[in-house]
């Protein structure tokens, strides 16, 4: 009789993380594990194994044998923002500059997970600031979006966190952030509205106090 592999046996017998190619490209993830990462991954694998059983699946069938490992690895990637400090990223790329007009990086691709259902939401972020003696490397604005996105989120908080990190480090005359995203928790379940888009904004400084500055930003992101 074939012995069923229990969640604890997954940890004992699983392959190292250099692992197999499942054909979807997930084997290209960063597979370097610390001891703590390994323990976390083992716990995630056991949880996924149990979930598969609870939804009525057989975790031992061929197509699911490596699913706990793959899901655990995916979760490590999708939540890696918990282990990064966005303000430190900004601090590393600050430059003194007299430029005092708007700096806008628009259409930054964004992928995150709703903390209520752990389903993805994705879309675009538009980030602008008006310098006050300091500018930052443009890629760091996109990196700030990425770090906060790679956490369990609600879009409203995500928008504010991006604004606040930039405001805290650069101390500019103002920051503006708009996020437009589609939430799969509204598409795959619940109201099942396929074409719904959620838009959130967070402003500070002159983007709050000057209607013309705010209006310029909103016009630019709609082009």
From Swiss-Prot:
Amino acids binding Zn(2+): 114, 117, 185
Chemical reaction(s) catalysed: GTP + H2O = 7,8-dihydroneopterin 3'-triphosphate + formate + H(+)
Source organism, top-level taxon: Bacteria
InterPro entries: GTP-CH-I_C/QueF (IPR043133), GTP-CH-I_N (IPR043134), GTP_CycHdrlase_I (IPR001474), GTP_CycHdrlase_I_CS (IPR018234), GTP_CycHdrlase_I_dom (IPR020602)
Enzyme Commission number(s): 3.5.4.16
GO molecular function: GTP binding; GTP cyclohydrolase I activity; zinc ion binding
Record GO cellular component, one term: cytoplasm
Metabolic or biological pathway, per its Swiss-Prot or TrEMBL entry: Cofactor biosynthesis; 7,8-dihydroneopterin triphosphate biosynthesis; 7,8-dihydroneopterin triphosphate from GTP: step 1/1
Keywords associated with the record: GTP-binding, Hydrolase, Metal-binding, Nucleotide-binding, One-carbon metabolism, Zinc
Stretches that traverse the bilayer: none
Broad EC category: hydrolase
GO biological process, one term: tetrahydrofolate biosynthetic process
The keyword Endoplasmic reticulum is annotated on this UniProt entry: no
Family: Belongs to the GTP cyclohydrolase I family.
Subunit structure: Homomer.
Protein name, entry field: GTP cyclohydrolase 1
Organism from which the protein derives: Chlorobium chlorochromatii (strain CaD3)
Taxon lineage: Bacteria, Pseudomonadati, Chlorobiota, Chlorobiia, Chlorobiales
Encoding gene per record: folE
């Amino acid at each position: 009789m074939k012995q069923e592999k229990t969640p604890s046996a997954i940890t004992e017998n699983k392959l190292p993380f250099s692992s197999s190619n499942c054909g979807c490209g997930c084997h290209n993830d960063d597979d370097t594990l610390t001891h703590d990462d390994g323990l976390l991954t083992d716990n995630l694998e056991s949880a996924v194994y149990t979930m598969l059983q609870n939804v009525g699946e057989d975790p031992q069938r061929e197509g699911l044998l490596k699913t706990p490992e793959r899901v655990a690895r995916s979760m490590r990637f999708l939540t890696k923002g918990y282990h990064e400090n966005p303000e430190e990223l900004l601090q590393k790329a600050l430059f003194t500059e007299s430029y005092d007009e708007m700096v806008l990086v628009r259409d930054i691709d964004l992928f995150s997970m709703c903390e209520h259902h752990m389903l993805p939401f994705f879309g675009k972020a538009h980030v602008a600031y008006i310098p006050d003696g300091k500018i930052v490397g443009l890629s760091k604005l996109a990196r700030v979006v990425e770090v906060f996105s790679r956490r369990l989120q609600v879009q409203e908080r995500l928008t504010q966190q991006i604004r606040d990190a930039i405001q805290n480090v650069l101390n500019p005359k103002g920051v503006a952030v708009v996020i437009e995203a589609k939430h799969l928790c509204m598409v795959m379940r619940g109201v099942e509205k396929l074409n719904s888009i959620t838009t959130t904004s967070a402003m500070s400084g002159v983007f709050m106090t000057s209607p013309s500055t705010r209006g310029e930003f909103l016009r630019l992101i709609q082009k």
